[in-house]
Amino acid sequence: ILIIHYNIKTHFIFKLITKLDINYLFSLVNVVPSNIEANKNINYKKILSLKALARIFSNRIIGFLKRYFQKIKSPNYLLAGGLKSLKSPQASIINNSTKIIWTHTYDFDEYLLNNKKKDNDIIHAIKNNFAVFIDAPSPLIKHDALIPGISSPLTANVYFPSLCKFFDKIEKRLNIEVIIAAHPRSNHLNRPEYFGKRRVFKHMTIDLIKKCKLVINRNSTAINFAVLYSKPIIFHTSKQISNHFSMTHQIYSMANLLDKVPINIDALENIDWNNQLNINKKLYVNYSNQYIKNPKSKNKYLWDIVIREIND
């Protein structure tokens, strides 16, 4: 079972599988929005550097050529999530003999589990009138899970003051408390200064999103939970982010698919805050179908589906 992507760095693994003629399952359940056609209002000339172009060329073009000319063995099974799984460049590794198993993202497993359990005491004690900010690794951890091998453009001394002003605006205009859903890899204390002494909860992201009135996001795929629970989402960007191709691309890809325009936290004038609470239900359903779960796949746990399909 391979949950790694094919690229220049992982080529040797696929080459070894081919040499030893090993049967394998290739996973593409967590495809994220990144289509160029989904992006609007981005100044590509400003942010698309030679380094970014070189990275795209090496991972996609050279990777494809290596697979083609060196005859990399195709997987016996492809584990697919949303309908966009087969549109991913990684899907070019399959052939006509590959059996496609339609399932869903790992987030949907967590969604199924969460719907079966009762609120814990902490969640039960939190008042419903709150917005939840989905924390990300950077800038405290100098990388971002969605941009592997690339340093985050954010610096704590610039990002956090602007973020807190953003939270202040939301709390004042929408009469709502902002609380923090800590990233699993973070080490925040409760009510840290850099979050404006706001409450922080760890390992409770889905619980908080399920109960909140509004989700605040940068480029986290945890918006899957917001989509599944039909929660309004505010996306944000910043001056530092706007000069970084990968992060800008991810934020706008997600936002545009839900008919949202990211708010620049360094320019908070002339914002219709009440409009931020609106959602387009058709786009939410489409997002779920394309990136979370094939509408025809079963509402079963991912590996239960896989085991049954392989055994049939």
What label would you give each PLM region?
Residues 102-108, 112-113, 164, 176-229, ...:
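Donor nucleotide-activated moiety binding/catalytic core segment of transferases
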Residues 1-114, 222-223:
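Active-site and donor-binding regions of nucleotide-sugar-utilizing enzymes
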Residues 110-189:
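Conserved catalytic-core segment of nucleotide-activated headgroup transferases in glycan assembly
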